[in-house]
């Protein structure tokens, strides 16, 4: 559970870096955050020692939502409630339906061989979504590193069509929502 606390703290601080100067005063429009617990349903994600990525992302997402809801001026939604399959486009569409200011997609670097470690944050390679995603990711990575997690960096990746590689980033960018995918 120590890692969950670290991720939550880093996420909160990342929001501060991104929206710190513009978190609304009482009565103003709230900052709307969508948290996407990666995988779900039949899509287990990575598996190691009886743990599945879909369950770990949900545990952390629920804890993050509970913590963030304690703060005035922040509205939080989860893209999926419970263990169900959702396409990446459906997740981005859900965030858009809530008028999300930011979409945070949660994953874990894990493998049976234990050859994946540390954390990395993926953001859009394009426009304002890149700038806002990178701003969030910078604060996030700085804090995760201070907490002792190995920094694998802030990254972008393109597919063979020259678009953002990760579907959740591509679909959220198409809807004008800055996003970050943390591994």
Question: Residues of each region from the PLM?
Answer:
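Bacterial N-terminal signal peptides that target proteins for export
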Residues: 1-8
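Bacterial N-terminal signal peptides
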Residues: 10-19
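Sec-dependent signal peptide cleavage junction
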Residues: 19-29
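Active-site-proximal helix/loop segments of hydrolytic enzymes
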Residues: 28-32, 58-183
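Short glycine-rich His-centered loop
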Residues: 31-50
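Extracytoplasmic Gram-positive cell-surface binding/anchoring modules and repeats
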Residues: 54
